[in-house]
Amino acid sequence: MTLLSLRNIRKSFGAVDVLHGVDLTIAAGEVVGLVGDNGAGKSTLMKTITGIYRADTGSIEFDGSDILGLDPGQRRRLGIEMIYQDLSLAKQQDVASNIFLGREPTKKLFGLVPGFVDKAEMDRQASRMIERLGAHLPSINRSVGSFSGGQQQTVAIARALTFNPKLVIMDEPTAALAVREVQSVLDLIRRLRSEGIAVILISHRLNDVLSVTDRIVVLRHGRADADLVTANTNMNEVVSRIVGGGDIAAAAAHEQRG
């Protein structure tokens, strides 16, 4: 079942054309890698999906509804969630405070009027969310700034899940992580897929993309240059598509950088 459908998406900033008629479909529960060199249009495309940017032309349908005219908040309520590379965590606060930031459950005074933040309930729900992910954190009462990069990624994913998303867009989730933490994050992505949540994975780490995705879409100069079934492709083909095909020296150099 198609969850997200983009047709002929174009986006310009002044005289600069960034997206040139991009088509993209994502099925429910599918993990799709979005790859391409810097400047290929990945960030612009993702911000067009989330509503931060408005497409100049084309159509965007999500879960059967036209969302082209909706703002980011409306799209989020429909089930589109994005985890940015910087994670946007309040690092001086603990796990529950980050997960419920701005949406804290409250206790009712005398059983009638909402009053104080219910920290105990926040902690209970946060613990259940981390358990749902099959992840481990040192303590939900510690500031997330004391956590490793992979543990912080876990908190960001848990926060995204509280919005009951149907699609989670992840921007470079394994960048600068140790090998063990990379595997933990990839396992979290697999867990999302097992729950029927679609994932768009933006990454320059092609080994990670190949290990966890169902399909790989290559953006090149603002166009969807290739849509590959992961099981039927390999590193060489993906790199060749990224650099334009046929340039063996450039492909080898790109693979060494990745």
Each model region followed by its residue ranges:
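Glycine-rich phosphate-binding loops of nucleotide-dependent enzymes
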Residues: 1-258
